[in-house]
C-alpha cells in the first residue's frame, strides 16, 4: 500500500452499501465511515492484509497512474463534502483507522501519502472529499509533529456558493434525498471537469 485516498459517498449509508455490495456496480471501497462513526470494512485492509479496491478510477499522482493498484480507499458518508461538514464521529473514527494503517503499512506513516479523490482525479471532475473536509485537522490529529502537505479543494468558491443554495430544494423523503444529492454531485463533477478542460484548452 502506497497511498490512502479519501472520498465522500454522495448518497446515504444504505445506498452506499447497496452500491458497493453489488458486483454489477464495478465499484468498491475498503472502508465506509458513517456519520455516527461506525466503520464498515468492505474490502480487507485493517489487519495488514489488503485486497484491491475499485475506488480511484482513472487516476494519477506524481507520475503514478492507476491508484487502485496501490491505495486504500475510505468513503465518508456525506451527500456532498462541498455542502455538508463531516461529523466529529467521522474524524474520531479516522483517527482509529489511521492508527491501524500506520501500524501495518509503513508508507502511510508519511502524511504526503494521504490524498483526496479530487487530487488524483480532479481532471475528471472529482470533487471529494471537498472544501468542508478539514485537512489541517486531519493532519494535526494523525501526523502530530510532521509537516502537513497542502491539499486544496478543486471546487471553486463560486460553485460552492451555488451548491449551498440547493439545500433549500432538498426533498423531504429519505429515498428521494439520496438521489437528489447524487445528481448534485454529478453536476458538480461535470462543472469542474469543464472548468479543467477550459483551462487546458482540451
What are these regions (language model features)?
Residues 2-108:
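Active-site-adjacent loop/helix surface patches within enzyme catalytic domains
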Residues 80-202:
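Basic/polar, cationic surfaces and motifs that engage anionic cell-wall
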